Structure formats: structure tokens, C-alpha cells
């Protein structure tokens, strides 16, 4: 009964953790896609404004990759990212919107900016573990009891070469389950399988290829220059 209850609880927590992990990956991809689409939409504005907007977006992406991603592993965001958000938003108010095309482009930029904001906000929300301490304690306690019960029902007359692998197998399954829960509940950590800023890196490459001669006003880590 205890083993069954533990297995059901573990399966439920893994399912919830997988939903968090999937949401975190989707949020990072949505944010990166919105940044790329904003950079493409910038082509509908005069050259100087186009280049400034693309430069701000490149700096935003660099700050996300080099500053905010490591900060998320400590449960924080990056003020540098906020700085570049403020920069491109200020530019929105100065964009030329004399033609119908430019008016439509501004509306598209605002919509994409909202999508980017939602993606980033979900990304920052998902970097905080969602499994509460009492649930972790219940999982650890249940796993320990399951292993202890396995030990208590063995026949001492059996050879250790038979009992050892059986007990080790149960303990291994319990430990593996707990590790999977931890992995899914910490989606942005640097462990194998952790979500990396690969989507934003790809966006940066694509945006820079749109205008190879563009020189953004920031360092490779997104710091203003």
C-alpha cells in the first residue's frame, strides 16, 4: 500500500513537473520568436529608426543570453534586460508613422512586444521551483519507507547475491524518480537537459544576418557602450 501510494504521488508530481518544464521551454521559444519578428517588422520604418530598433533588440537578446540566463539559475532577473526593454519602448514613441504601412507596422510591433513580454514573464516565473517543501518531504519519506519495506520483507536465509540487486533496484528507482522531479522543477539549471538560451542565440544570429553591417550600441554581453 505504501509503495503504491508513493508511486501514484511520484507519477503525479512528475506530470506536474513536466508541464512546468514544457511551459518554460515554450516561453523561451515564444520570446525569441517575438524578438525576431520585431526585428523583421523594423524594416518597414526609415533606415535610421530601423537600425536603432534592431540594435536595441540585439542588445536585449545578448543581455538575455549572457546576463539573465545565469541570473535565473539564482532565481533572479537582469536589470540590464529591463534597460534594453525601456530603450526600445522609448523608440516606439519616436517612430515615424505617417503612412498607413508605418501605422500598421507600429501596431504589429506593439503586439509582438506584448508577446515578448508574456514569454519573458513566464520564463522568469518558471525559474522558481514550484514543488513546495512539504511535498518534497512527503516524496523523500515515501521513498525511504518503500525501500525500508522492501528490506523488511526479505528472507534472511536468502543469499545476499540475490537480495542485494533486488533492494538496490528498488532504491535506484526511488532515487531516479526523485532526480527526475528535481530536474523538471529546475528547468533552467545548467544540468544535462536544462533549457538553454538556444532559441535566443538563433534569433541573434538571424537578426545580425538581416543587416551584417549593423553595429549595436552594446558589448557581446549586452552592456551599453
State where each predicted segment sits:
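Structured inter-helical modules in multipass membrane proteins
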Residues: 23-25, 30, 36-128
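Alpha-helical transmembrane anchor segments
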Residues: 128-219
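Solvent-exposed, non-transmembrane helices and loops of integral membrane proteins
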Residues: 39-61, 65, 189-225
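A near-ubiquitous, low-amplitude feature marking generic local secondary-structure context
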Residues: 14, 18, 40, 71, ...
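Transmembrane signal-anchor/signal-peptide helices with a preference for the extracytoplasmic
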Residues: 5-29, 185
